[in-house]
């Protein structure tokens, strides 16, 4: 009741007070705890608003488990900060379950993973035609590169493309994405989120370069609110991620003549 709320003591905190600890295995070594702070909500709010195109009247479904960084950042914090109604599904994955869920709750914005999207592709159009999915207006993906075939398929069966996004546990929010106002190039990661400086550094020297079509390591200038502040009890590993004023994502990509990023693979070429 309200009387209990009035007596509840809120722990004093600032924008830089630690708020979330997300564990990430990366590709090598033991899992590392990426520590984020309260200030992260600014990045998650603004990227949810402009990359996922969330509006107050939307019914939003992020299919990620809340124990995963996407399920926290974009399944809880970002959409809540935008005042958006969210749906949570507690059932196993089948095309029938998912399409029924979208139809029943009139989902308008759907954020999912490429693996799930490809599984839906295998189920075919017949599964889609059983349901009224006309409420959908915006589709986005995260978790791994979204292949061009999946983007083309989604436009055919849903009447709209999936917008791929790119970020990591350590970045805390989207770094590169296909946002609503830009043309989607199937298979591309998109472009850097406005206000973030994202580029490529040489694979061997880690020096920044600006050459179209040349593969390098994705790097981000530190300073965005959701950037992780530490690896829990592992300062040496944290410091290794920053070289010459850049945070190194550890992923390789190229940039085309229009500024679109194209994922190539992990820098260490190891599959976890």
Segment roles from a protein language model:
Residues 2-23, 30, 53-59, 136:
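Conserved pre-ATP/AMP-binding loop-to-beta segment of ANL
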Residues 10, 95-99, 128-130, 239:
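Short hydrophobic/charged patches on amphipathic alpha-helices used for structural packing
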Residues 10-13, 187-193, 210, 241-245:
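Short Gly/Pro-enriched turn/cap motifs at secondary-structure boundaries
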Residues 18, 24-27, 60, 102, ...:
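Conserved S/T- and glycine-rich ATP-binding loop of Class I adenylate-forming
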Residues 81-84, 107-112, 121-184, 193, ...:
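Gly/Ser/Thr-rich phosphate-binding loop
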Residues 210, 219-272:
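Conserved ATP-binding/catalytic segment of the ANL
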């Amino acid at each position: 009741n309200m009387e209990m709320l009035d007596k509840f003591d809120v722990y004093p905190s600032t924008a830089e007070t630690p708020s979330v600890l997300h564990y990430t295995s990366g590709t090598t070594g033991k899992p590392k705890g990426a520590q984020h702070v309260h200030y992260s909500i600014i990045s998650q709010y603004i990227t949810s608003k402009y990359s996922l195109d969330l509006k107050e009247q939307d019914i939003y479904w992020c299919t990620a488990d809340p124990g995963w960084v996407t399920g926290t950042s974009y399944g809880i914090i970002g959409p809540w900060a935008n005042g958006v109604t969210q749906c949570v599904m507690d059932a196993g994955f089948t095309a029938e379950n998912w399409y029924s869920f979208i139809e029943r709750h009139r989902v308008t914005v759907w954020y999912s993973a490429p693996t799930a999207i490809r599984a839906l592709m295998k189920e075919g159009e017949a599964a889609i035609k059983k349901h009224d999915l006309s409420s959908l207006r915006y589709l986005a993906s995260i978790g791994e590169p979204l292949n061009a075939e999946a983007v083309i398929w989604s436009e055919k069966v849903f009447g709209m493309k999936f917008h791929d996004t790119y970020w990591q546990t350590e970045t805390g929010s989207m770094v590169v994405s296909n946002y609503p106002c830009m043309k989607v190039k199937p298979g591309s990661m998109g472009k850097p989120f406005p206000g973030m400086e994202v580029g490529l550094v040489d694979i061997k020297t880690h020096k920044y370069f600006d050459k179209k079509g040349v593969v390098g390591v994705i790097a981000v200038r530190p300073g965005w609110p959701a950037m992780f502040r530490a690896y829990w009890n592992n300062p040496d590993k944290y410091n290794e991620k920053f070289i010459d004023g850049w945070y190194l994502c550890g992923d390789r990509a190229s940039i085309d003549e229009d500024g679109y990023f194209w994922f190539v693979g992990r820098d260490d070429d190891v599959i976890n």
